[in-house]
């Protein structure tokens, strides 16, 4: 009987720890509810005519931030190899 009580207590402690971890991860992944109401997917912050996520760019042309997948993401121009001698630069999250 004592073993059963100990196992029950350990399993309850594990469930509680998992719930705390999931709550913490949810807070990290999502911005505050006020930000979610104001921003919509695709909204950007930056100078007029700045490039959005996954658009070809040169250095300094990307928007500062774009709201994607429920979070503000800072953007930067990243160059990816598209061939042996060539590369393609696109705006990606930092």
From Swiss-Prot:
Keywords: Disulfide bond, Ion channel impairing toxin, Knottin, Neurotoxin, Presynaptic neurotoxin, Secreted, Signal, Toxin, Voltage-gated sodium channel impairing toxin. The record marks 58, 70, 78, 81, 85-86, 93 as: Interacts with insect Nav channel. One of its GO terms (molecular function) is sodium channel regulator activity. Expressed by the venom gland. Residues 1-17 form the signal peptide. Changing residue 86 to A: Severe decrease of activation of B.germanica sodium channel. Disulfide bonds join 50-63, 57-77, 62-91, 79-89. GO terms for cellular component: extracellular region; host cell presynaptic membrane. Transmembrane segments: none annotated. Negative results: has no effect on the human Nav channel subtypes Nav1.1-Nav1.7, and no effect on hERG (Kv11.1) and Kv2.1. Is non-toxic to mice at 657 pmol/g (4.2 mg/kg) i.p. and 156 pmol/g (1.0 mg/kg) i.c.v. Insecticidal toxin. This toxin promotes opening of insect Nav channels. The toxin binds to the S1-S2 and S3-S4 loops in the domain II voltage-sensor of insect Nav channels (i.e., receptor site 4). The American cockroach P.americana is largely resistant to the effects of this toxin due to an unusual sequence within the domain II S1-S2 loop. In vivo, paralyzes lepidopteran and dipteran larvae. Paralyzed insects ultimately die from secondary effects of starvation and dehydration. Belongs to the neurotoxin 26 (DTX) family. This is Beta-diguetoxin-Dc1a.
């Amino acid at each position: 009987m004592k073993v059963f009580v100990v196992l029950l207590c350990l399993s309850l402690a594990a469930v509680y720890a998992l719930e705390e971890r999931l709550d913490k991860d949810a807070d990290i992944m999502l911005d505050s509810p006020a930000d979610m109401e104001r921003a919509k997917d695709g909204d950007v912050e930056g100078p007029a005519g700045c490039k959005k996520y996954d658009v070809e760019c040169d250095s300094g042309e990307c928007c500062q931030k774009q709201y994607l997948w429920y979070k503000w993401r800072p953007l930067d121009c990243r160059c990816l190899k598209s061939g042996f001698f060539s590369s393609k630069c696109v705006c990606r999250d930092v």
